[in-house]
Design a protein with these regions (language model features):
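A charged, well-structured terminal subsegment
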Residues: 115-137
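Active-site nucleophile and cofactor-binding loops and adjacent substrate-binding regions
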Residues: 32-37, 73-75, 113
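Intrinsic disorder/low-complexity segments
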Residues: 133-162
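Glycine-rich phosphate/diphosphate-binding loop of Rossmann-like nucleotide-binding domains
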Residues: 1-36
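Phosphate-binding/catalytic loops
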Residues: 101-115
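Short, acidic/small-residue loops that bind anionic groups at enzyme active sites
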Residues: 72-99
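Glycine-rich oxoanion-binding loops at beta->alpha junctions
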Residues: 33-51, 97, 102-103
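Glycine-rich phosphate-binding loop
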Residues: 8, 40-82
Length: 162
């Protein structure tokens, strides 16, 4: 979670934790890591994912548009970095980074009017972690049921044709 714009990100964090607990997570299994700002989120997410200790990573932050191009650069890099980390590590990453034009929009998305994006990110993280586990189990079961290559089209099959 990014500390920058903490008034917003702390609300996102509380709702994300609430969502995880409601879905059956144990408090002791929820790790919270704080980073200075949104730009640091992808690096921290990748570092955590590479440990192999986490089923999913929930990335929380808040970016507010200012009067310069800085916002656009940071939004693009954070988004790209989170997606890249998820693809490279194979660990699901939920995107809970608000990208808002105004503080009012951020407040709304942090729970006052439009739901809470932290809670939504927690739901997405659990759904994707569950999907990964299901696919992994199905894959390991189907590998056990496969016919050995030699019996399908290898040496044994060629000998019988001659």
């Amino acid at each position: 979670m990014a500390r920058f714009n903490a008034f917003i990100t702390e609300r996102l964090l509380l709702s994300a934790c609430d969502g995880l607990l409601k879905l059956g997570a144990r408090r002791k299994d929820i790790a919270v890591v704080r980073v200075p700002g949104a730009f640091e989120i992808p690096s921290a997410a990748r570092t955590l994912a590479l440990t192999g200790k986490y089923d999913a990573i929930i990335c929380l932050g808040c970016l507010l548009r200012g009067g310069t191009a800085h916002y656009d650069v940071i939004v693009n890099e954070v988004t790209r970095g989170i997606g890249q980390s998820a693809q490279e590590t194979g660990v699901p990453h939920a995107f809970g980074v608000l990208t808002c034009d105004t503080l009012e929009q951020a407040i709304d998305r942090a729970g006052l009017k439009m739901g809470n994006k932290g809670f939504e990110a927690a739901l997405a993280a659990v759904e994707m972690a569950t999907l990964k586990q299901v696919v992994s189990r199905q894959s390991s079961v189907s590998k056990k049921k496969q016919i050995p290559r030699s019996a399908r089209n290898g040496k044994d099959a060629r000998k019988k044709r001659r």
